[in-house]
Regions:
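A beta-strand edge to alpha-helix "cap/lid" segment located at domain peripheries
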Residues: 2-5, 9, 15-16, 33, ...
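Short, solvent-exposed secondary-structure junction/capping segments
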Residues: 8-12, 24-38
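Short beta-edge strand/loop motif at the mouth of beta-sheet-based domains
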Residues: 29, 39-49
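Short amphipathic alpha-helical segments, especially helix-boundary/capping motifs
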Residues: 23-28, 40, 76-78, 100
Length: 136
């Protein structure tokens, strides 16, 4: 399977919000780097990280417009969005969307690194307005 095909499956599994299926495509030493440069290392830690994020934003989604492959690296340009849950409620005013890019490293058909580039201001504005605290 080409690296781009692996990443398309990874994006699809993010949209399914099934952390176990998502983890199946991560290498044991998977590395996640968020848009602030914070890193989570390891498949099991990232499985828990995704579970926490899907609790925080239960309808989180990603989409792609452009994908470029260079060897085992894949660059994805698209958008992400969802609704921030506040006290378990998904209110329309807590819906967000942001242009997003991802850079992935694929080895042996698994995602070894997933790096996010996004402007998180829409999420921060919702958190500030609602006094919501992410639960991870």
């Amino acid at each position: 399977m080409r690296p781009t095909e692996t990443i398309l499956q990874f994006l699809d599994r993010i949209n399914q919000r099934d952390v176990n299926k998502l983890a199946e495509l991560m290498s044991e030493d998977h590395r996640f780097v968020d848009s602030l440069g914070q890193t989570v290392q390891g498949r099991d830690k990232m499985r828990a990280g995704w579970q926490g994020y899907f609790t925080f934003c239960p309808d989180y989604w990603v989409s792609h417009e452009e994908i470029f492959e260079d060897g085992n690296r894949v660059a994805v340009f698209g958008s992400a969005g969802g609704t921030i849950a506040v006290s378990g409620n998904l209110l329309p005013e807590n819906k967000w969307r942001a242009n997003t890019a991802w850079l992935a490293v694929v080895e042996n058909g698994l995602v070894k690194e997933w790096r996010v580039y996004a402007d998180n201001k829409p999420v921060y504005d919702i958190l500030a307005r609602s006094k919501a605290v992410p639960q991870a």
